[in-house]
Amino acid sequence: MSAVLVTAREFVGDVIGQEAAQFLRFHASARRGVDPESVHQLRVSTRRLRTDLDFLRSLLDSSWYRDVREDLAWIGGRLGARRDFDVLIAFLEELASTDESLDRSVIFRAETMRDRGRDGVERALGRTRYHKLLVTLIDATLWPPLRDPDVIVRRIILDKLGSSWDKLRLASDTVTNEASDLHRLRIVVKRSRYAMEIASPFLDESRPIVQRLARVQDELGQLHDDVVTCDFVVAWYRSARAARGVDPFDASDAWLNAIHKRGEQRRDLWRAPLAEALVLIDDVSRNSSYLEWSEGEQSI
């Protein structure tokens, strides 16, 4: 069947099925705690599916959407508690490898907290709630819980994509160098990227835009990691548990200087790919052919 005439049943089932496959692929090794990358990929799938379901919400049964999204938020939180410390420790180790004067007690603290997170992941992935979520997602690939299974989705998806572009333009126009602003921009970029990937069957020009948005997301993610690391370092050296014999102010300042030095090298690397993506999006928007209606299409 032509992509133009694909129904909600076919389209939504395929979207959910792709992420359900990722869940199954990485579940076993993530549960055993032997592969940090599996935890990362499982968390990515969780976040991706939540964003995809938000994008497709108008097509989905409302109670199913609400329940599944709640379960995804729950398991995503458990996975995040582990993955955030994997990233934090890798970053701290990278900095410490280039400066032996940096106090390592903060790394030991992060490793202790990561181990606690590992136990939480193993318990969560063994719970009935998670197993039921897997079954629900697998069922949804075959029988998507839709308001109208036979509706033609092309126009609906492209309308939603246009809305995501509007939000991206606004976020780009109003962003400042404040960390909170950059984090919000990253979320908008991520949602726009995923929307582009969902809409790709209807849009030949999606790939170069997706590639540039992925670069923006990665660069902004690095900057956010810097902020999280700074917060962790400051909290540790302000605590009574910080290493004895180490001046907490000197140790904290040394780490913060190292983090800021690396951050300055990357601070503006997201700007060029975002500008390129917006130019490409504007080019597509001016091409009215992708917005033309086909017989049988409607909006929701």
Give each language-model segment a name.
Residues 1-300:
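Function-determining surface determinants
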